[in-house]
Amino acid sequence: MTSDDRIKLEPIWKEALRDEFEQPYMAQLREFLRQEHAAGKEIYPPGPLIFNALNSTPLNNVKVVILGQDPYHGPNQAHGLCFSVQPGVPTPPSLVNIYKELKRDLNIDIPNHGCLQSWADQGVLLLNTTLTVERANAASHAGKGWQHFTDRIIQVVSEHQPHLVFLLWGAHAQSKQKLVDATKHLVLTSVHPSPLSAYKGFLGNGHFGRANKYLEQNGIEPIDWRLPVL
């Protein structure tokens, strides 16, 4: 992971984050990942998809930011977009609750899959704060350096343009609120959509409709939260 041409990273993101690739923490993170691979550990998502959130949603296209924590750690799940899984994989419980809220809020039919790629393509930055994980070992790469990189991503997005929507669900996502200029953006918070907490305030939060209303009020095309049938 360097800022040279070996890294597939969308050009505007690459320029905006160039200095981060030269930071000492990034060298340490590269070495950690190298050692994990050398030890035969299976790392998710696959290398080409680590930066999928950035490549799918160029900086100039960002309208909404949804923060997750770390990638799913089961086979064929993670593909670099938070809360999303690859087509053909069962929809995870938190995403089931996201779909329930979409149905309640906007009467959107619950899709038959868990792939949120169409949201990313429209300008929803689906960013995990840790971008890799070891198979079957949740949060195994937390604290290894990714948090510095993704904190900078959040800051860059906040600084880059006004009138974005940040959806911060759960304590971990809300801990990043300090990185966002709330005078320029709409910040919406609630409990996490996990089955452990969704019924304590996630279901009924109205975030998707409120996000679109804010975008429209500021002359920005809203998100079509409907997902295509796969």
UniProtKB/Swiss-Prot annotation:
Protein name listed in UniProt: Uracil-DNA glycosylase
Alphabetized SUPFAM superfamilies for the sequence: Uracil-DNA glycosylase-like
**Top-level EC class, please?**
hydrolase
Give the positions the UniProt entry annotates as the active site: 70 (proton acceptor)
What are the protein's GO molecular function terms? uracil DNA N-glycosylase activity
What are the top taxonomic ranks of the organism? Bacteria, Pseudomonadati, Pseudomonadota, Gammaproteobacteria, Pseudomonadales
One GO biological process term is: base-excision repair, AP site formation via deaminated base removal
Species source reads Pseudomonas savastanoi pv. phaseolicola (strain 1448A / Race 6)
Cellular location of this protein?
Cytoplasm
What Enzyme Commission number(s) appear in the record?
Answer: 3.2.2.27
By sequence similarity, the record places it as follows:
Belongs to the uracil-DNA glycosylase (UDG) superfamily. UNG family.
Q: Which PANTHER family match?
A: URACIL-DNA GLYCOSYLASE (PTHR11264:SF0)
